[in-house]
């Protein structure tokens, strides 16, 4: 996956809120810059010092927790499946995480570019996405995320 230029807004934060169930402080996608429902999405997460996790992780050297980077990638994956026709309504949740690697710290002031691609969708209930997060073109996190539909 290659980084697109984050200039065009395909989905605003308000439109994202209409597609995902997450809300502050757990809404981790600021805008979508490339989107093909059922196939792929590229989104932006701006990392700011006023986010609540930095009060404790770590006050003297704030670092974005890796689990929140993975959650941001999962939310972008959720956008991919959010508009697939004939998909049952319900909540998609994590079912597994494979091969996730963290390559460098993410700090306030960084802009995560998150790219996700749907790898599989079985019985319209179980799926897998490939996800990558970069900052200024450098890979910071990658892996495969599995999800399942909860009725």
From Swiss-Prot:
Signal peptide: none
Enzyme class: lyase
Gene Ontology biological process terms from the UniProt entry: fatty acid biosynthetic process; lipid A biosynthetic process
Location, primary (coarse class): cytoplasm
InterPro entries per UniProt: FabA_FabZ, FabZ, HotDog_dom_sf
Subcellular location: Cytoplasm
Catalytic activity: a (3R)-hydroxyacyl-[ACP] = a (2E)-enoyl-[ACP] + H2O
Active-site residues from the entry: 57
Role of this protein: Involved in unsaturated fatty acids biosynthesis. Catalyzes the dehydration of short chain beta-hydroxyacyl-ACPs and long chain saturated and unsaturated beta-hydroxyacyl-ACPs.
Name of this chain's protein: 3-hydroxyacyl-[acyl-carrier-protein] dehydratase FabZ
Gene source species: Synechococcus sp. (strain CC9902)
